[in-house]
Amino acid sequence: MKRVILHCDLNNFYASVECLYHPELRDKPVAVCGSIEDRHGIVLAKNYAAKKYKVKTGETVWEAKNKCPGLVVVKANHSLYYKFSKYARQIYEYYTDRVESFGLDECWLDVSESTLLFGDGTKIANEIRERIKRELGVTVSVGVSYNKVFAKLGSDMKKPDAVTVITENDFKEKIWGLPVEALLYVGDSTKKKLNNMAVFTIGDLANCHSEFLVRQLGKWGYTLWSFANGYDTSPVAKNDCEIPIKSIGNSLTAPRDLTNNEDVRILIYVLSESVGERLRSHNLKGRTVQISIKDPELQTLERQAGLDIHTSITSEIAQKAYEIFLKSWNWSKNVRALGVRVTDLVESDTCTQISLFSDDIKRQKLEILDECVDRVRERFGYYSVRRGILLQDRGLNRI
């Protein structure tokens, strides 16, 4: 059976939901931010009116307001967005049980076996588009294709409120002329490497020798070559299929450039608290800590190191992340953003190898401390309990 894959992308999702609840904002440039009090708060989403002023996701509030003085800044309401995401998913699940989330605002649907009931992929896509608009009051762009990568490309090609079809017969004409960074998983770093090889479009990538790409990019080179040529065969997960968590991490763009080790240490603790809490909430612990460091020119360095024992203890994660940073960064440039991630995960009650060098009594106390902090924050809010190190710079500890 020929596959029929949809990719549904709710347009300007956060901003669209806010405008739905605040109709007076509908014709104004709007940005949704993590913090509206802090001028260094980050833009999480924006509407089309703000896009006309070249407001970008990920830039600071003050940068956005410099571009658009009339910008209306709204504090993010994640519980509301989650509710709308769930409503959209219920509509998708009317057509298929194969619905795979890609963030709150995007989903893949495999409707291959649904076409006998509901019509072809284009008909299903248009029906979903109309229902989302009618029942939820927001719009969605839908890509229709025979694989996940091209379906995602299709939903990106026409916005808002549109359906784009990419077939086996016309994909070269429709997508090979697009910039290579339009392809799924081609980020800034990979784009730069490909551009240095004179690969600027998806067609350039598709027409490279796969062996050459493997030599330059490793196994990932072959994967990207396959994507560009339409060979993606990855399945859409069933909606009742629980995908195992392989890593837990968090990253932040600092409200100002970090200029010394103590700045970095503070931000690493902020990130490690988030990572540790999420590990504990999922009943997981990990043995490998990864960090990513981005400079003001957006160049990224990634490093990792192992721990002596699996852990979800915040202070152990932070200490290892800071050790990696000290070994990896020579301060030839400032630091713009940091990320901390824990991998090599196992369930917390899994028997693991004992380290001869760990202090079990001290570790038990730290585990109890973290659990107590989690409970207090759950009841009274995140800022009800703070580590002393985070009081050294209030500009960093409130992000």
Curated annotation (Swiss-Prot):
Substrate discrimination (site feature) positions: 14
Cofactor note: Binds 2 magnesium ions per subunit.
Predominant place of localization: cytoplasm
Biological-process GO terms, alphabetical: DNA-templated DNA replication; error-prone translesion synthesis; SOS response
Enzyme superclass (EC): transferase
GO MF annotation: an example: DNA-directed DNA polymerase activity
Pfam families the UniProt entry points to: IMS, IMS_C
Keyword Manganese: no
Signal peptide boundaries: none
Subcellular location: Cytoplasm
GO cellular component: cytosol
CC cofactor: Mg(2+)
InterPro entries reported in the protein's UniProt record: DNA/RNA_pol_sf, DNA_pol_Y-fam_lit_finger_sf, DNA_pol_Y-fam_little_finger, DNA_polymerase-Y, DNApol_IV, Rev_trsase/Diguanyl_cyclase, UmuC
Catalytic center residues: 106
NCBIfam families referenced in this protein's UniProt entry, alphabetically: PRK02406.1
Gene that this sequence comes from: dinB
Record-given protein name: DNA polymerase IV
Location of the UmuC domain: 5-187
Keyword Magnesium: yes
EC code(s) of this entry: 2.7.7.7
Keywords from the UniProt entry: Cytoplasm, DNA damage, DNA repair, DNA replication, DNA-binding, DNA-directed DNA polymerase, Magnesium, Metal-binding, Mutator protein, Nucleotidyltransferase, Transferase
Subunit structure: Monomer.
Role, per record: Poorly processive, error-prone DNA polymerase involved in untargeted mutagenesis. Copies undamaged DNA at stalled replication forks, which arise in vivo from mismatched or misaligned primer ends. These misaligned primers can be extended by PolIV. Exhibits no 3'-5' exonuclease (proofreading) activity. May be involved in translesional synthesis, in conjunction with the beta clamp from PolIII.
